[in-house]
Each structure stands twice: as structure tokens, then as C-alpha cells.
Amino acid sequence: MNEEIRQRTKWFMEDRFGMFIHWGLYAIPGGEWNGKVYPGAAEWLKSWAKVPSGEWLELMKQWNPTKFDARKWAKMAKEMGVRYVKITTKHHEGFCLWPSKYTENTVANTPYKKDLLGEMVKAYNDEGIDVHFYFSVMDWSHPDWRYDVKTPEDSAAFSRFLTFTDNQLKELATLYPTVKDFWFDGTWDASIKKNGWWTAHVERMLKEMLPGVTINSRLRADDYGKRHFDSNGHLMGDYESGYERRLPDPVKDLKVTLWDWEACMTVPENQWGYHKDWSLSYVKTPVEVLERIVHAVSMGGNMVVNFGPQADGDFRSEEKELAKSIGAWMKKNGQCIYGCDYAGWEKQPWGYYTRKGSDVYMVVFNCPYSKHLTVKTPKGTQVVKAALLNGKSVKVVETARNEYNVDMPAQEPGEPFVIKLQIKEAAGVVDKYRDALT
């Protein structure tokens, strides 16, 4: 990774943990249309139920989130321990949370009228939380959107659509200059892949307007239609964003530790927008959410956990409870997350390693009956001492060269816990390990 990209993505290593907000007209029906409940992703309901755009956009007349309070949203995120939030400025349906002058399908033309996006940007920034913009290139509401470009008429229409999209992106960058990142979606269709030049143009345009802004890999396509990574295998954009509701394997996929990457996950199995019935799919527990966060950080990545607000502007009780649970754990254990990176140590069944400087953190999710946690260090690395984050020492016994048993606490904490290892290593150990991966 070149130094220019590394400087732009320094926030990755510092922040590590973010929140996703999927909010749009789809929150009003909440997965149900004309009496039928669709188990698929609620933000795709227009597609599942085959609702014409004109009929779908009639939902704008009902958009009036009277319980919305951006300051409460921001405080909840702060208490949860997130360092940044990604907000859906516009999802595939085409409804804009800001008063765009390039379309009628905006919050300005609803009973609510006010600039929701602007309220959120200010509230989150006031809490010290960076704001990132999700933006769907695909726009079901626009007459010039095309899934493919096959005729001269398609080409002319799609050219107009790209100009429209340019204008909306420039508008967002101008109205909200504190935005730190653009996270693009809806770029997988042939129409975009045949216009890879445009994705490169958008990246340049935004970086000229907002020096330091980062762009996800999902935007980009090269001249051959390859996405995320070009035909030569080089990452496009500033960080890889292909890990959606999945994570790289901690043993087989170590290549990801060589670049910045970010995963995003839902709490139900596949619901990004608000769905009224979470019983239709498995819902992750707070510990399962925590494990995915730690898993990502242990491989040098970030994790973004999604919340789908209700149409009235409030969050469902399950999301509020999840935020409290995650926040309580982060308050005690956040030092093993923020600013941490891949440790380069052999994965063990009890959990994950993260690293910050000469400190290696053991984040324990699975407790062995032996009460001993096996640690295997790279050649040239010694464990000097071990302690819980409250400062209590933990016994360490060297059982073989570069192998140790680390005792569990006398009393199990009843939740995932962290042991900090202070280490000493020969010069160049980490660099040699990373070089071996290239």
C-alpha cells in the first residue's frame, strides 16, 4: 500500500468500529406490502413486491419521523463506542435524506420537510463521531437509470444519469464538507462495469473537492469490468469493502492484512432497513456481534454494525439494548479495539489476538476446561508478562520454545474478557512476517 493511501486511511486503525444507518421510505412498510410480509431485506421491498416507482414514492406523503432526534441518535452511538457512522444518503429507491435540488424525491417534499442528513451530520460531529456517506449509484426512481447499456438510446439516457449522479455527489460534498468517507453501493450492474472510467472520475472529483476523503472499493470498476481489485490484482479505492455479512477466514485469508478493509454486518440475518418482524430470521446476540467486531480487528480490518431505524425516527428496543451491551463492553475493553491491528500470531481456539505496539491483546471467547490458554508466539518473540485490563497479573508459564500457557482468571468474568501481553521481540520479526505474505 502506498504512503498516500496509508495517510488517508489512518483513521482506519484509530477508529476500527463504526455504525451503519439504513433509513429510507422502506422503513414505512417495514417489509410488508398489501398485506403480504416479505422475509427478504426490507430495503429491497420495492423489488420483492414489484411496486412501480410512482406508487412507491407515494410513501413520501407519509414520511414524518416525529420521534427523530439526531442528538439522541448521536449519544446512543457515542455510548455504544462507535467512532464513525455511515448514513444512507440515498438507497436504491432514490429517496434522498437531504434536500437535493436535482430531484423531487427528497425529504424536502415530505411532511417533515427538514434536512435530516444535515441534522445528523451536526449531531454526530458534535459528539466527536465522524460521518461517512453511503450513496447508491443505482437509482430505481430515475428514468435514465439503466441496468445495461445496449442501444444508442440507452447510452444517451445513461450519460444523462451519470451527469445527474455527478451533480448529486458534488452537492453532498459542498453541503456537508465534514464528511470523511463515501461508501458507494449499487455498482454491480453491467451499465456501471461498462463505464469504469466514470468510477475513476468520481473518485478523483471527490478527492479534489474534499482533500483527505476516502472512497470504498465497491465504487470502482476497471476497463475490463473488474470490481474492487483491477485486472492486475491491485485494490481500487482506498480500502476493500467486499465483506458484507461475512468475514475473511483467520487462517486462510491472511492476505487481507496487507491492506485496509472494512466489513459490515446486520443484526438479523439479512435486514439492513427496518423490518417489522425480526422473528423471520436469526438475530445475533451481543456476544456474537462482539466476536465479529474483534474478528475483524484481529485481521487488521474495521467492523460496521447496522441499525435500521423505524419510520417514526426511533430505534427498536432490541437495537437500543444491543447498543448498551456493546457500549458497556467497549468501555471496559476498548483498548483491544481502537488503534489495534493484526498481531501476526497463530490463531488459537479460545479467541483472537489484536496488537498495539509492544502490547498484544488476547480476546477470549471460548474458555478451555484446562483453564490454560495456549499461546504460540512467532520466532524471536517472548511474552514478558500478562495481566487483565484491571491490572491484575495473570500467570504465564513457558511450556516449550515460543509456546506458553496463560492462566485464566480465578473467577470467570461471564463475558468475553481480555488479557494484555507485554512482549519483547527481536528486530524485524513483524516485518519479516509481513514480507512472507507478499
What do these predicted ranges mean?
Residues 1-438:
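Mature catalytic domains of secreted/periplasmic carbohydrate-active enzymes
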